[in-house]
Amino acid sequence: MIAAGDFRKGVTIEVDGQIFTVVDFMHVKPGKGAAFVRTKLKNIMTGAVIERTFSPTEKFEEAQIERREMQYLYNDGEFYYFMDTETYEQIPLSYDKVEEAMKYIKENMIVTVKFYKGEAFSVEPPTFVELEVIDTEPGVRGDTVTGGSKPATVETGAVIQVPLFINVGDKIKIDTRTGEYIERV
């Protein structure tokens, strides 16, 4: 059991028979009246985001999420296919379950797939990935009015802000939690 006052981002709870992940939360202590916790919850099966308010002492059952290492194989236009690295079992996942993670995942990459009661609902890329820059404008010396960064498209199609010295063909390290450039590899 977890109290609403102990919520953190990423905690998975059961509310009204459905499973939600805490996307955002805020403890509110008004001048008058009791304190409360305002939350944004994402339904793990439907992807719908709702806003709910709870008392800080209200308790919820923490959902038991299974995590498995899987290898991304391919996309057939409708589904993304992942293979369990131990059993070699393949599972298809629809775009709505993997859309955010696919910005950083390329074929044959090992990822973490989350399951609830045997059903896959989400894909988590590694914390750091190394991807090749396929398109960016050339950096001009002395052009630091924009803060010394420019947009670059990597091989998965994601657009990342990178320093001016990064060129097409460079491999860069990206933090998948924030989508930020870390270093040139």
Swiss-Prot record:
Keyword set, alphabetical order:
Cytoplasm, Elongation factor, Protein biosynthesis
Q: Which family does it belong to?
A: Belongs to the elongation factor P family.
Instruction: Respond yes or no to whether keyword Cytoplasm is given for this record.
Output: yes
BP GO annotations: peptide biosynthetic process
GO MF annotations for this entry? translation elongation factor activity
* Recorded superkingdom: Bacteria
Q: List the disulfide bonds.
A: none
Does the record's keyword annotation contain Cell membrane?
no
Q: Which PANTHER family match?
A: ELONGATION FACTOR P, ELONGATION FACTOR P (EF-P) FAMILY PROTEIN
Question: What is this protein's name?
Answer: Elongation factor P
Function in brief: Involved in peptide bond synthesis. Stimulates efficient translation and peptide-bond synthesis on native or reconstituted 70S ribosomes in vitro. Probably functions indirectly by altering the affinity of the ribosome for aminoacyl-tRNA, thus increasing their reactivity as acceptors for peptidyl transferase.
Identify the species of origin.
Answer: Caldanaerobacter subterraneus subsp. tengcongensis (strain DSM 15242 / JCM 11007 / NBRC 100824 / MB4)
Q: Which residues form a coiled coil?
A: none
- HAMAP family hit by this protein: EF_P
Gene this chain is encoded by: efp
Q: Name one GO cellular component term.
A: cytoplasm
Q: Where in the cell is it found?
A: Cytoplasm
Question: SMART domains in the record, alphabetically?
Answer: EFP, Elong-fact-P_C
Pathway(s) per entry: Protein biosynthesis; polypeptide chain elongation
